[in-house]
Design a protein with these regions (language model features):
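N-terminal strand-loop-strand
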Residues: 2-74, 102-103
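Glycine-/small-residue-rich active-site loops that bind phosphorylated ligands and cofactors
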Residues: 27, 81-82, 151-152
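NUDIX/MutT-family hydrolases
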Residues: 71-73, 126-128, 134-171
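Short histidine-centered catalytic/ligand-binding loop motif
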Residues: 73-84
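Structural detector for helix-capping/boundary residues
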Residues: 78, 92, 96, 146-149
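Conserved acetyl-CoA-binding loop-helix of GNAT-fold acetyltransferases
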Residues: 85-91
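Active-site segment of metal-dependent pyrophosphate-handling enzymes
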Residues: 91, 95-133
Length: 173
């Protein structure tokens, strides 16, 4: 039997051709770092972004979302650059957002989510690690270990609760 369905398989050479466009609401492929303080698994490295740090380049945060993202706690994260591997994105986030060149990471864990009425798809890769102290970086107004059990969902940037829950760091409701 032959089908005219176009399955959501992304490949340069798929035969027959598969997906020719993205979902109406868009699709984001991102990497997230969930770094806990050594010996304190509930204390996670999060920050409030510095709006003047070029987040359109280092984290794929567009001008529209910059204000909203600056007001909440956010994990070090970014969309993947076209053809970048999830592991490559995690290493780039370490360098560009945290100024770290050598950090052990486990992962990735993967998660998928849809949001909004416009059928937006999110595919995320989560990398976990541990550190004894928070780095200092000009990308962040504030970068510190936060006890996530003390945070309310509305204090975090969009999807951070989901990422932390998938990583086993946030109690699910």
């Amino acid at each position: 039997m032959t089908t005219d369905r176009r399955f959501a398989a992304f490949s340069k050479n798929a035969q027959p051709p598969r997906m020719r466009s993205v979902p109406e609401g868009g699709m984001c492929i991102s990497a997230f770092l969930v770094i806990s303080r050594k010996g304190e698994p509930g204390s996670i490295l999060m920050g409030r972004i510095n709006k003047n740090a070029g987040w359109d380049h280092i984290g794929a945060v567009n001008q529209k979302n910059l204000e909203r993202f600056a007001s909440g706690w956010m994990l070090p994260s970014s969309h993947l650059i076209l053809f970048e591997t999830p592991e490559g994105a995690a290493r780039r986030i370490l360098r560009e957002q945290l100024g770290i060149r050598n950090q052990a990471l486990e992962g990735p864990l993967t998660f998928a989510d849809t949001s909004g009425t416009s059928n937006h798809w999110d595919l995320g890769f989560i990398f976990k690690g541990e550190r004894e102290s928070a780095p200092s970086s000009p990308a962040w107004e504030k970068l510190t270990f936060v006890n996530v059990a003390d945070l309310r969902e509305e204090e975090m940037v969009r999807h951070q609760v989901d990422v932390l829950a998938y990583a086993g760091k946030f109690p699910t409701k």
